[in-house]
A protein has these predicted regions:
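Single conserved hydrophobic/aromatic residue that forms the stacking wall/gate
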Residues: 1-9, 13
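N-terminal glycine-rich dinucleotide-binding loop that anchors FAD/FMN and/or NAD(P) in oxidoreductases
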Residues: 10-29
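Conserved beta-strand segments of alpha/beta enzyme cores
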Residues: 24, 55, 82, 169-171
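A conserved short coil-to-beta-strand element within the FAD-binding core of flavoproteins
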Residues: 27-39
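Conserved beta-strand-loop-beta-strand element in the redox core of flavoprotein oxidoreductases
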Residues: 36-55, 61
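FAD-site-proximal beta/loop scaffold in flavoenzymes
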Residues: 55-132, 216
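A conserved FAD-binding loop/helix module that cradles the flavin
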Residues: 105-162, 241-255
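Flexible, glycine-rich terminal cap/loop adjacent to redox cofactors
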Residues: 148-255
Length: 255
């Protein structure tokens, strides 16, 4: 799977939004034990900063353990198919396995486990078998992702911290969701938009949207990035009003 990227600025907005909904986040926590009670469960954990034990009572406990391909017992090695340590089939940029006549698509090939990538896997393999054989996995980078929280979180490209580490000269813009008319008409003013632009080329390096309609708006940023468009295209684009998309006008106006 792909690790969730974030940044200090968007983290502040996310924590504030969750806190208003009565959701508390405990960081640096290490679970020690959990047991049933008459009313639900009790979790014992420690704070890694000082090893102080804490007790948390709740109705239920959700374990987010991730997913892995169910390839055990398929005897894939007999067909010449190699797997990685998690059981995912090892593939090349055309999704061809180590057995030249076998391809893999979807979660079984590991990597980012998104439905929309599985659909693109189909396009790549179809192109390889019946097309010009040019389509490959590198063509779809960068890939956006969405977490359907309330408000939803969408991201594409690098975070500000990643871009700084790679030596980019940056311009960064932030826009509170409350500044977008559509967010006010929907009474969904929590969150923010953030964009990172290469100061020398004007190309968009990354974008984080933590606001209503983020899953839709991120696709416009993705389209601009994949086509190597200058940020001014989104800055000057005529969007419908009122819509969350027109927030991109103001977000990129700051550069």
């Amino acid at each position: 799977s792909t690790p969730i990227k974030s940044s200090a600025a968007s983290d502040v907005y996310k924590r504030q939004s969750l806190k208003r909904k009565g959701i508390e986040i405990r960081l640096n926590a290490y679970a020690l034990s959990v047991y049933d009670t008459a009313d639900g469960i009790t979790l014992t954990y420690t704070d890694n900063s000082d090893n102080t034990p804490y007790f948390w009572e709740g109705d239920a406990l959700l374990l987010a353990t991730g997913r892995r391909p169910m390839t055990d017992g398929l005897n894939l090695h007999a067909a010449g198919i190699r797997t990685d340590t998690r059981g995912a089939l090892i593939v090349n940029e055309h999704l061809q396995t180590t057995a030249p006549h076998i391809w893999a698509m979807g979660d079984v090939r590991g990597g980012a486990l998104y439905d929309y990538l599985s659909l693109d896997d189909f396009r790549i393999i179809t192109n390889r078998l019946f097309g010009n054989k040019k389509r490959k996995t590198d063509d779809r980078i960068p890939v956006p992702y969405v977490i359907f929280t309330d408000p939803p979180l969408a991201h594409i490209g690098m975070t500000e911290e990643e871009a700084v580490k790679r030596g980019y000269s940056l311009q960064v813009s932030r826009l509170p969701a409350a500044a977008i008319p559509r967010a006010r008409t929907l009474q969904q003013i929590d969150g923010m938009m953030k964009a990172i632009v290469n100061a020398h080329t004007g190309r968009i390096i990354g974008c984080t949207l933590f606001c209503i309609d983020a899953p839709e708006v991120i696709n416009l940023v993705s389209l601009a990035m994949k086509n190597d468009l200058h940020y001014s295209i989104l800055r000057d684009f005529i969007f419908t009003h009122p819509s969350m998309s027109e927030g991109l006008n103001d977000l990129f106006k700051a550069f």
